[in-house]
């Protein structure tokens, strides 16, 4: 089991400031069409983000570089050689110029063997936080699956064993895939959490500024980008009561975001300045409730009848006043309060604030709910018009709170 601090770290939203290089071969393959390449990369990033959402990671594209003149280092078919060259180029050239958490080389070269991608495992926030993916198929979703897979390796996730499952499949970390992968398996999530707690990568905890993002804003990707006030996902998935998921704008001030649950609760309204509903607030203590049968106390409406029903069941109600007069005796079970270990009898006006008496409906008995010390009337219970129980006495509701 994890410590609370470990759980906080795992639950924290994480952001990968992501830099993509498109090499010269890929540029030529797409007929020197930079706008088309950009759209393709933006679509890939969006697809990758959808896959990483359950892991609480957002991929923020903070740089896209297309090598339209020539490659800045030699891109070779040997995947491991190109990965090493890319790592060195990022370290010496890219990082001094543009800080990033992770960089990807998207290449048009045909990598040796069956490989379409390669990554350093468990390397985020280090000098080895890079991976290479071959743009091997016109289907964007297939290449985006490979991007997700290789970035998964950077995040300490291993290939899935035969016992790892995800429904619907196929799983992202399968060694061989023919169809676009759907989601991470339970094995992948376990690997990722173990990696996080072992290596504690810190660079993914800071949230990039919306002005740093180079991809166009997408309403519904859970990330507040330029022109958006909030982003809580799709309208079906949105959990933020004061964010309009369709427009990514705050709901107007005064829109009800949480209805009153009962008459001792208050409705909450959006402020117009936040995506979240304000903290749940309660009706003030002493406010009449349940058709004047009680007065609100800490968000509840305590009455003697409700106490009897809660303890004994729906066939019971509060006893007639004659039963409560027994509380003036001050003996074993019938008293108002304790002082220094002594049971203090009730004054006549306080009898309904002492021991609780219940009656089965249509009978005249003075029943005491089973408890060796007797059950006392709850604080805040109505004991007369404008009167409530406080510390075993029946006092004016105005002075009680």
Swiss-Prot record:
Chain ranges of the Disintegrin domain: 216-285
GO biological processes: proteolysis
Residues bearing carbohydrate: 112
Subunit structure: Monomer.
Entry EC number(s): 3.4.24.-
Family of the protein in this entry: Belongs to the venom metalloproteinase (M12B) family. P-III subfamily. P-IIIa sub-subfamily.
Cofactor notes: Binds 1 zinc ion per subunit.
PANTHER family: ADAM A DISINTEGRIN AND METALLOPROTEASE DOMAIN, DISINTEGRIN AND METALLOPROTEINASE DOMAIN-CONTAINING PROTEIN 28
Function: Snake venom zinc protease that inhibits hemostasis by binding and cleaving the vWF in humans. Also has and inhibitory effect on the collagen-induced platelet aggregation.
Tissues with expression: Expressed by the venom gland.
GO CC entries: extracellular region; plasma membrane
Enzyme class: hydrolase
Positions annotated to bind Ca(2+) 2: 218, 221, 223, 225, 228, 231
UniProt feature coiled coil, ranges: none
Span of domain Peptidase M12B: 14-208
InterPro entries in the record: ADAM_Cys-rich, Disintegrin_dom, Disintegrin_dom_sf, MetalloPept_cat_dom_sf, Peptidase_M12B, Reprolysin_adamalysin
Annotated positions binding Ca(2+) 3: 265-266, 268, 280
Cofactor names: Zn(2+)
Gene3D superfamilies, per database record: 3.40.1620.60, Collagenase (Catalytic Domain), Disintegrin domain
SS bond list: 125-203, 164-187, 166-171, 219-248, 230-243, 232-238, 257-277, 264-296, 289-301, 308-358, 323-366, 336-346, 353-389, 383-394
Name of protein: Hemorrhagic metalloproteinase-disintegrin-like kaouthiagin
Motif, D/ECD-tripeptide: chain positions: 263-265
């Amino acid at each position: 089991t994890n410590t609370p601090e470990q759980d906080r770290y795992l639950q924290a939203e994480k952001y990968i400031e992501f830099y993509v290089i498109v090499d010269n071969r890929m540029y030529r393959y797409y007929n020197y069409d930079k706008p088309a390449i950009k759209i393709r990369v933006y679509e890939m990033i969006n697809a990758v983000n959808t896959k990483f959402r359950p892991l609480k990671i957002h991929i923020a594209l903070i740089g896209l570089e297309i090598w339209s003149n020539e490659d800045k280092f030699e891109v070779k078919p040997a995947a491991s050689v190109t990965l090493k060259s890319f790592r060195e180029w990022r370290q010496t050239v890219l990082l001094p110029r543009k800080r990033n958490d992770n960089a990807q080389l998207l290449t048009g070269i045909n990598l040796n063997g069956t490989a379409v991608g390669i990554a350093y495992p468990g390397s985020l926030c280090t000098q080895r936080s890079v991976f290479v993916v071959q743009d091997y198929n016109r289907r964007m979703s297939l290449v985006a699956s490979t991007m997700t897979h290789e970035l998964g390796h950077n995040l300490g996730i291993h290939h899935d064993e035969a016992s790892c499952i995800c429904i619907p499949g196929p799983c992202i970390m399968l060694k061989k895939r023919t169809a676009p992968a759907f989601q991470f398996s339970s094995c992948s999530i376990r690997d990722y959490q173990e990696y996080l707690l072992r290596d504690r990568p810190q660079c993914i905890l800071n949230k990039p500024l919306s002005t740093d993002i180079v991809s166009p804003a997408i309403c519904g990707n859970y990330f507040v980008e330029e022109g958006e006030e909030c982003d809580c996902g799709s309208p079906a998935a949105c959990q933020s009561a004061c964010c309009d998921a369709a427009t990514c704008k705050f709901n107007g001030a005064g829109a009800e975001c949480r209805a009153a649950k009962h008459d001792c609760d208050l409705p909450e309204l959006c402020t117009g300045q936040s995506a979240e509903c304000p903290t749940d607030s309660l009706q003030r203590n002493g406010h009449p409730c349940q058709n004047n049968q009680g007065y609100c106390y800490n968000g509840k409406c305590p009455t003697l009848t409700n106490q009897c029903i809660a303890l004994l069941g729906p066939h019971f109600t509060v006893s007639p006043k004659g039963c409560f007069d027994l509380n003036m005796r001050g003996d074993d079970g019938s008293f108002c309060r304790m002082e220094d270990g002594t049971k203090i009898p009730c004054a006549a006006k306080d009898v309904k604030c002492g021991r609780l008496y219940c009656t089965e409906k249509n009978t005249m008995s003075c029943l005491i709910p089973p408890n060796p010390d007797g059950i006392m009337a709850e604080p805040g219970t109505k004991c007369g018009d404008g009167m409530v129980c406080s510390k075993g006495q029946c006092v004016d509701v105005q002075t009680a709170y």
